[in-house]
Amino acid sequence: MRKIASLFVALLLLAGCSSVPLTGRKQVLLVSDQEVLSSSLTQYNDYIKTAKKSTNVNKSAMVTRVGKKIAAATEDYLRANGMADEVKNFSWEFNLVNDPQVNAFCMPGGKIVVYEGLLPLVSSDDELA
């Protein structure tokens, strides 16, 4: 019975194995990319509904400007490395929230949030990036 259970577990692990496109290393996928994207979009939308967006037009414009440059560079990189089909998984959004914490985060699919508390520590677009 143990041999059968061990064989079953081994088969499950092998079925979930795949190669990382860029590096070729092996990975075990317990959750599909689509499930991750769907879940992260739900979590992001829940967060954005409760977060207080910044009213500072200049700072918000800076976050969007830098974000668009990062998005373009990311998409160029994916295309140049044979992963153009991954670009469809991104629906870029850039938000500045009115929160004094020094923080920022991104979610799968191109959802980026910057906290206002981070901006006094940067003096240029390059530093924010």
Where are these regions (language model features)?
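Peri-catalytic and regulatory segments of divalent metal-dependent proteins
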Residues: 18-129
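C-terminal motif of bacterial Sec signal peptides marking the signal peptidase cleavage site
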Residues: 13-16
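Sec-dependent signal peptide recognition
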Residues: 2-10
